[in-house]
Structures are given as C-alpha cells and as structure tokens.
C-alpha cells in the first residue's frame, strides 16, 4: 500500500495528518510520501480549498482513492480499512 499526503504551507491540519501518517506507517508498514503544493502548481489550483488530501493506493491493479478528510480520526479509519484491503488483495 502507498499513501501520498498533499499539503500546503501554513496548514495545521496538514501537519497533524503528516504526524498521524508517520505513526500509522510505523504500525502498518506502508509506503508514505508527503508532497507540498504551492500557488502556481497545476494541482494547487485543482485542489484549492481541499487540503489536506490523501491519496491511497492499495495495490497496483486498484485505482488510487483521493480523499478529502477533516479529522485525524477519519484519516486513521480510512488508512486502516485500506491496509486491510491491501492485505486481503495480497492474499488472493
């Protein structure tokens, strides 16, 4: 499983999600990357108003899920569900 956090500067929730994802990464063992977007970046305009965004890829054959979350509890739930799905897909 691979998780990408899309962040911007001066985003306290982005920072909180980053540290939550680091904790979850050590617990569940997924690949994690944080990408900072800035004004002028094509994705910044597309995602404007929707930070932080989390991109979860459970397997190479499954499409990624880009989700807009509003709490660390929501983030933890989504990541644990995705990790369970990724483990199930590996077993198949």
Language-model features: where?
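Local sequence-structure signature of Cys/Sec-based thiol-disulfide redox active-site neighborhoods
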Residues: 1-23
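N-terminal secretory/membrane-targeting helices
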Residues: 2, 27, 31, 89-91
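Thiol-based oxidoreductase modules, predominantly thioredoxin-like and allied folds used
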Residues: 29-41
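Short glycine-biased active-site loop of nucleotidyltransferases that positions the nucleotide triphosphate
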Residues: 44-46
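Structural micro-motif
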Residues: 48-55
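Non-catalytic, surface beta->alpha helical segment in thiol-disulfide oxidoreductase systems
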Residues: 56-91
